[in-house]
Amino acid sequence: MITDMQLAIFSNVLGVFLFLLVVAYHYINANTGKPSAKAK
């Protein structure tokens, strides 16, 4: 069985990974989109 400590570590690692995935997605999406208004 999974102990409480293993479950806590797993959930924390999963949460950090998903948070970083969302941050990376937004960073990539913001920097590789349509040309900005500054490019005129």
Curated annotation (Swiss-Prot):
SUPFAM superfamilies according to UniProt: Oligosaccharyltransferase subunit ost4p (SSF103464)
Cytoplasmic compartment residues: 29-40
Keywords (A to Z) from UniProt: Endoplasmic reticulum, Membrane, Signal-anchor, Transmembrane, Transmembrane helix
Residues annotated as transmembrane: 8-28
Lumenal face of the membrane: 1-7
InterPro entries, per database record: Oligosaccaryltransferase, OST4, Ost4p_sf
Any single GO BP term: protein N-linked glycosylation
Subcellular location: Endoplasmic reticulum membrane
GO-annotated cellular components: oligosaccharyltransferase complex
Recorded topology in the membrane: Single-pass type III membrane protein
Subunit details: Component of the oligosaccharyltransferase (OST) complex.
UniProt record similarity statement: Belongs to the OST4 family.
Protein task: Subunit of the oligosaccharyl transferase (OST) complex that catalyzes the initial transfer of a defined glycan (Glc(3)Man(9)GlcNAc(2) in eukaryotes) from the lipid carrier dolichol-pyrophosphate to an asparagine residue within an Asn-X-Ser/Thr consensus motif in nascent polypeptide chains, the first step in protein N-glycosylation. N-glycosylation occurs cotranslationally and the complex associates with the Sec61 complex at the channel-forming translocon complex that mediates protein translocation across the endoplasmic reticulum (ER). All subunits are required for a maximal enzyme activity.
Record's protein name: Dolichyl-diphosphooligosaccharide--protein glycosyltransferase subunit 4
